């Protein structure tokens, strides 16, 4: 089966997928660390969600921020120790970035909650679903017919309809979403359709750095684009096809495969 992570890697750089598949046979912890970091971020968001239910409409923005922040530091500290004990070479700067992003997100959420409570004249508990719909996290999906498998970061369920959400820590484009993010999302959408016998018309990319959830329409062209990418991934992973790529200074400068790529 093709893992959605292979599609993501191919969309970033086909040569990176080739090297990971056929050349780099050394065991590394990068993938597991990425999973743990993403899980930590989603658990933090879930804790903010729980804290929100205690907010009253008469609270000030500062009080709302304080309430949303309850137990956040303690949770991040304990989770960080757990990850460090896994010997995954966790960079402390990565945790600092997560802390900064978390409190930035809390400030934005506090402003939105205060505005919503003022307009609706309700406590946060009564409007929680506006900000945090019923959802499932890190849901494993697969389709044996498509030979596709992956983990969807989040699936929101609103009025019986399913909305896949991909969570991104990267910088977003000025408008819309990056092509590779859209392709990953439509892959998850198709798997959601198979898993829950439903139709998915819209999904979302959540860009953490600006706390912005952007919609993506799951149209025919995007679905066709996914199948073309799947074909290209199979050419590399199954047929050992060496891809032609152009050097991109922004992508290549920090890539751990830069030297191996030049050799090939």
Regions found by a protein language model. Give the residues of each.
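Alpha-helix boundary/capping residues
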Residues: 14, 24-25, 230-233, 259
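Metal-dependent nuclease catalytic cores that hydrolyze phosphodiester bonds in DNA/RNA
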Residues: 1-155
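Short C-terminal domain-edge/linker segments immediately following a structured domain
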Residues: 39-42, 49-51, 194-200, 234-237, ...
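Cysteine-cluster motifs in flexible loop/terminal segments that predominantly coordinate metals
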Residues: 5-19, 238-264
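Mg2+/Mn2+-dependent nuclease catalytic core
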Residues: 125-232
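Charged/polar, low-hydrophobicity segments characteristic of intrinsically disordered regions
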Residues: 46-59, 218-235
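Short helix-capping/linker segments at secondary-structure and domain boundaries
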Residues: 20-29, 193-199, 263-264
